[in-house]
Amino acid sequence: MSEKKYTFETEVDKLLHLVIHSLYSNREIFLRELVSNSSDAIEKLRYESISNAALNEDDTDYAIRIDFDKDAKTITVSDNGIGMTEEEVIENLGTIAKSGTKKFLESLTGDKSKDNELIGQFGVGFYSSFIVADKVTVRTRKAGQDKSQATKWVSDAQNGFTVEIITKEKRGTEVILHIKKEHLDLLEYHVLKGLVNKYSDCINTPIQMKKVEYDKDGKQTVKDEYETVNNTKAIWLRSKGEVTNEEYQEFYKYISHDFADALMWIHNKVEGNLEYNSLLYIPQNKPFDFWNRDKDYGLSLYVRRVFIMENKELLPPYLRFVKGVIDSADLPLNVSREILQHNKVIDKIKKAITTKILSELKKLASKDKEKYQKFWDSFGQVLKEGVSDDYSNKEKIAGLLRFATTQSGDSKQTVSLADYISRMKESQDTIYYITSDSYKAAANNPQLEAFKKKGIEVILMTDRIDEWMMSTLTEFDDKHMKSIIKGDIDLDKFETPENKEKFEKEAKDFEKVLKEIKEVLKDKVEDVRLSKRLTDSPSCVVVNDYGMSLHMQKMMEEAGQSFMPGMGMKPILELNAEHNLVQKLKNEADTEIFADLSELLLLQAMFVEGAKIEDPMAFVKLVNKYIR
């Protein structure tokens, strides 16, 4: 059959350009990526052949082979895995099905060091071949297909690609790289074997190369016999003492396609009623598309060394940053995703590894604060999801949380709840916090004034998830958690008798004027009262103990979400009796000015709180009216 010519989709063209021009300094990854693809193809066949043995075509000696030809200037990576059909070749090698590709391309900065890191997080897979090759040929046949229905794919990365139907005796795929002249040094046995040992030594499948012998003068002879050049015992099945730190890190890079080292790993073997091996990694940095809800996540599930699938059910969503492998002896080889969703063994493994991860994070936080801080900066926001999502581990997760506070001095989240409790005032039995949409807005919120004056530390929460999290986290270590922007604040135990008496007198003096202000504001407020929070500012707004904060109401409205009954309620206006503006209001006889000042005190408090101002122009006009 004659060859057919195709053009790459636009995003592939862009990615190829990036690979060729940005990753030249990381050329070694091409072999890791091709070996990884071959390993995946073999694992797929191994799994498919459980239910259809004919796919093996009487060949169960699964292997990946690496050959090089100095005369032809080629490197060939071949496997006897599942192979591809013509349609799969066009789909897999001509387009990028990976979600978030466009966002990834838009996120590139032009800074090569930063872009290299982003490209590494994205994973370029097969296209890394063009780092070292000016032409790539792929010959492949799907297991079970007729020998005459194989497919040949050819591209120089410049002018699209061609596809034609060919005859191929053996199933599987071979990728032939026509090496660029500046990379001809790769055409050496010791170079290629070194790359295998560096990047792919621990994969499950044998990687084979032709034997090389050297005579007494150092001249090499390549034999026709193949030998295995990698350690085929799965790294997760080896004892910890057998695995070096370098091997752990290279296996992480192999499964994650990350350029950076893992932050930490957890290697565990469980025996008894439930038997499994696990090797789990926590990355240093979150990938560029970490918040993409459509992105798949999960550990690789093996059953007795046979790869089954990537499985989300092995981890709760708030631990989706964890990479790694679970190998169980207690599951059937023909297990399906549907069966896994209702499998008691999977449920037990999930519970056990979740507990293990949280335990190891607690140890890390205790032993290496700097490394834990790096983890928190990358994944703290997603860990917070667990407070609401995982009731059984809520207290453990809460102990891992970190925050900025009024005493920490900047926006960096470094203070644990245990740290806060250790610094509480002698008679304090409540953990105070404030939620806001930015650090500066929280740190300068007028509702902190009384707390600062009395030396009471307040936690500053500024992540979007915080208020949702705190609706579940109502106490920690037997201490009540209290938002300072909700409900009444009782600081009487920190007050002198003189100040208590003074406040009671002011409340009585303002009783009439507070009623008048409430009448003026009518449907805009739930109540008007004197504040125990304010010392310098004239006014603030709060909601009741069970209401949703005003900035949260604003975020939900902007997202087009409706409120549950009672959540989107009117604010409570609090006034500082000692402020000049409030004193002026108290003594104001002109009804128009009284109404304007009442409105102004409410609107400026709403503005400071980040609440939605229904008519911003009316607010501006009101301010301008009284600027002298």
Curated annotation (Swiss-Prot):
* Keyword ATP-binding part of the UniProt annotation: yes
Superkingdom per UniProt? Bacteria
Q: Keywords of this protein's UniProt record, alphabetized?
A: ATP-binding, Chaperone, Cytoplasm, Nucleotide-binding, Stress response
Give the protein family: Belongs to the heat shock protein 90 family.
Coiled-coil spans in chain: none
Q: Which GO terms describe its cellular component?
A: cytoplasm
Annotated region B: where? 338-554
HAMAP family this protein is in? HSP90
Localization per record:
Cytoplasm
Which coarse location class describes where this protein primarily resides?
Answer: cytoplasm
Entry's transmembrane regions: none
In the record, what terms sit under GO molecular function? Answer: ATP binding; ATP hydrolysis activity; ATP-dependent protein folding chaperone; unfolded protein binding
C: annotated span: 555-628
Region (A), start-end ranges: 1-337
| Cystine connections | none
The molecule here is called: Chaperone protein HtpG
Q: Which Pfam families match?
A: HATPase_c_3, HSP90
Identify the CDD domains for this entry.
Answer: HATPase_Hsp90-like
Per the entry, what this protein does is: Molecular chaperone. Has ATPase activity.
Q: How does it assemble?
A: Homodimer.
